[in-house]
Amino acid sequence: MRIGIVCPYSFDAHGGVQVHVMDLAGELFRRGHEVQVLAPASQDTELPDWVTSAGDSIAIPYNGSVARLNFGALVARRARRWLDAGDFDILHIHEPITPSVGMLALQAATGPVVGTFHAAMDRSLARELLSPATVPLMEKLSARIAVS
């Protein structure tokens, strides 16, 4: 199976979601699947051949931490090109409604999509303001996973 995985957080910094994505990709490889990963990363960051950089990220204070995300028209084009080139049987997006490359990939996705949610949080003004944009995106998900 051809599997595309999208990580919203930059591979320039170490974090739990990045580790989860890399461990998942490694296990899927071991099980015989073809895997490609798309994530923010600077040009200086060494990446495995199967990881594609979505471009540089910016640091944004979020949920008591700092999230290194990327977004915008250029990132959206990179995500579409990656999706087209990958011709994935399934797409697995981590934090699919976080404003980063994952959200852009979800907008462009045409096949089955699994969304994994890593962060639990109380209601927030940001989530409330983004709700009109995120509800249609949530409906595109074929399956949802919550990490405990």
Where are these regions (language model features)?
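Extreme N-terminal starter segment of soluble prokaryotic enzymes
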Residues: 1-3
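Histidine-centered beta-alpha loop that forms part of the nucleotide-sugar donor binding/catalytic region
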Residues: 8, 94-95, 117-121
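N-terminal strand-loop element at the rim of the active site
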Residues: 7-12, 22, 26-74
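An amphipathic, basic-hydrophobic alpha-helix
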Residues: 61-90, 100, 129-136
